[in-house]
A protein has these predicted regions:
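ATPase nucleotide-binding modules
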Residues: 155-167
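Short phosphate-engaging motifs
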Residues: 120, 137, 162-163, 189
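ABC transporter nucleotide-binding domains
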Residues: 1-113, 118-132, 136-138
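Short coil/turn segments
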Residues: 10, 68, 157-159, 185
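Non-catalytic alpha-helical coupling and interface elements of nucleotide-dependent molecular machines
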Residues: 29, 150, 198-202
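Conserved beta-strand-loop-alpha-helix hinge in the C-terminal portion
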Residues: 135-156
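C-terminal coupling/interaction segments
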Residues: 164-214
Length: 214
């Protein structure tokens, strides 16, 4: 029911990519043709078909992370837990892993992602929890967390300078201009995390001053 990719997975480097997946498949009770088909499917999903017969000691960091992601899916789990899946991976490899996570979402997997790379989290997650000093500080839908309250953004299409000069409240269509989008402008998860951390630091400093005053 659960697949897991730790931050620093350990693999037997003398095994090939295909042999590694077969090994974990057998640990999960998969055998025969079903296992062979599943290994081929996973290698295709993570883009390692051409490296299937290559030993892991010849894999790059990004390739090792992808084979790790494949092993977490070997038993077709309902929940996949990924702990820092792009740790030590170059930007290209990181983007490939991000795309893999998005593909898993599209295929119906539930992915629990733990990462310090908040930009990456913002790209792939629907719901987010922010932990600071060992406690959950904020949790909820991504769009709700990062929107900036009491501000409204408006995007216009084909708006003339004259129309822009007249905008004060309600925007009316003129010469083909149309309201494309209205809503709250967005912050980023990184800025939100920093705000939470700074707020927490101020609260601690205030509490310490009160204790000193007693």
């Amino acid at each position: 029911e659960i697949g897991f990719l730790p931050e620093n997975p350990y693999f037997y480097k003398h095994l090939t990519g295909a042999e590694t997946l077969k090994f974990y498949g057998k640990l999960c009770g998969i055998r025969g043709k079903k296992l062979k088909a599943r290994v081929a499917e996973l290698l295709e999903i993570v883009g390692l078909e051409d490296a299937a017969k290559r030993r892991l000691d010849g894999y790059s960091k990004g390739m090792l992370q992808r084979i790790g992601l494949a092993q977490s899916l070997v038993q077709n789990p309902r929940l996949v837990i990924l702990d820092e899946p792009t740790a030590g991976v170059d930007p290209v490899g990181s983007r490939e892993i991000r795309d893999l996570i998005l593909r898993l979402k599209e295929e119906g997997y539930t992915v629990f992602l733990c990462s310090h790379l908040l930009e990456q989290v913002q790209e792939v997650c629907d719901r987010v929890g922010i932990i600071f000093e060992g406690r959950m500080r904020r949790e909820g839908k991504l769009e709700e967390l990062i929107k900036i309250e009491k501000q409204t953004a408006m995007t216009l299409e084909n708006a003339s300078p004259e129309l822009l000069a007249k905008i004060e409240g309600l925007v009316a269509s003129e010469e083909g201009a149309a309201i494309v989008e209205t809503g709250h402008p967005r912050t980023t998860l990184e800025r939100l995390f920093i705000q939470i951390a700074e707020r927490r630091s101020k609260e601690k400093a205030s509490a310490e001053k009160k204790e000193e005053a007693l």
